[in-house]
């Protein structure tokens, strides 16, 4: 893998938000599709239609919002080949790696937590593995949304391709709303400010504070 020195977070100017997931209605509300959910909310909020683009192997849209041009992408390749779609968009528009923000689910974070970073490894996520492989670098921003680990005897694939329990749905809605705010903060105020503002939040409780006053303590076939 080509080693590219990550840019400082203050240098990053976002051009594209990528949400990861699996295509098809049977996967629409699964844990593994949290990235799709965020991009869908951004598209609705910004009035940007998402259209299937064969050249990008994904649903793509662009328009003006927050005072500038915004691009959104949902790879339709299934999770394990997400990098093909992201690479195609970067090549077509000549975008810098550091201008891409990837949104995806993360089992290492509990439901109710989210985490912004300027770079990093795939952490076992197959969609991120594919993107890192196709981009040849880990030096791009990402927003991880916690979905928690499997409970009891449930396996990993069953967990990430499973839906949210009714008791989890309220927390999920809060997380998705705050994820949209975090993306907009990245665009308007920069990644460093967004990291400081949103990474400490714990949205898991019924009275979770969204202002930071309640911080947390110090997969062709549907693919996982």
Swiss-Prot record:
The active site is at residue 32. GO terms for molecular function: peptidyl-tRNA hydrolase activity; tRNA binding. It is found in: Cytoplasm. Residues 203-224 are annotated as: Disordered. It is an enzyme of class 3 (hydrolase). Its EC number is 3.1.1.29. Its main location: cytoplasm. One of its GO terms (cellular component) is cytoplasm. It comes from the Bacteria. The record marks 105 as: Stabilizes the basic form of H active site to accept a proton. Keywords: Cytoplasm, Hydrolase, RNA-binding, tRNA-binding. TRNA binds at residues 27, 78, 80, 126. Signal peptide: none annotated. SUPFAM superfamilies: Peptidyl-tRNA hydrolase-like. Residues 203-215 have a biased composition (Low complexity). It catalyses: an N-acyl-L-alpha-aminoacyl-tRNA + H2O = an N-acyl-L-amino acid + a tRNA + H(+). The record marks 22 as: Discriminates between blocked and unblocked aminoacyl-tRNA. One of its GO terms (biological process) is protein quality control for misfolded or incompletely synthesized proteins. Monomer. Hydrolyzes ribosome-free peptidyl-tRNAs (with 1 or more amino acids incorporated), which drop off the ribosome during protein synthesis, or as a result of ribosome stalling. Catalyzes the release of premature peptidyl moieties from peptidyl-tRNA molecules trapped in stalled 50S ribosomal subunits, and thus maintains levels of free tRNAs and 50S ribosomes. Belongs to the PTH family. This is Peptidyl-tRNA hydrolase. It comes from Synechococcus sp. (strain JA-2-3B'a(2-13)).
């Amino acid at each position: 893998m080509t080693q590219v020195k990550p840019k400082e977070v203050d240098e990053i100017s976002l051009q594209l938000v990528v949400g990861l997931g699996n295509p098809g209605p049977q996967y629409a509300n699964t844990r593994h599709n949290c990235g799709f959910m965020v991009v869908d909310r951004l598209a609705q909020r910004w009035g940007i239609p998402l259209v299937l683009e064969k050249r990008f192997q994904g649903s793509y849209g662009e328009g003006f919002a927050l005072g500038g041009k915004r691009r959104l992408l949902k790879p339709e390749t299934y999770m394990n080949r997400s990098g093909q779609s992201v690479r195609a968009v970067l090549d077509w528009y000549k975008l810098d790696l550091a201008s891409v923000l990837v949104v995806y689910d993360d089992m290492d974070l509990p439901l109710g937590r989210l985490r912004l970073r300027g770079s990093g490894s795939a952490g076992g996520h197959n969609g991120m593995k594919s993107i890192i492989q196709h981009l040849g670098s880990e030096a791009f921003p990402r927003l991880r949304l916690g979905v928690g680990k499997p409970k009891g005897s449930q396996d990993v694939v069953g967990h990430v391709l499973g839906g949210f329990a009714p008791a989890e749905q309220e927390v999920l809605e809060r997380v998705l709303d705050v994820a949209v705010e975090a993306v907009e903060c990245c665009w308007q105020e920069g990644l460093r400010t967004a990291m400081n503002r949103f990474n400490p939040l714990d949205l898991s409780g019924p009275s979770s504070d969204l202002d930071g006053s309640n911080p947390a303590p110090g997969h062709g076939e549907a693919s996982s």
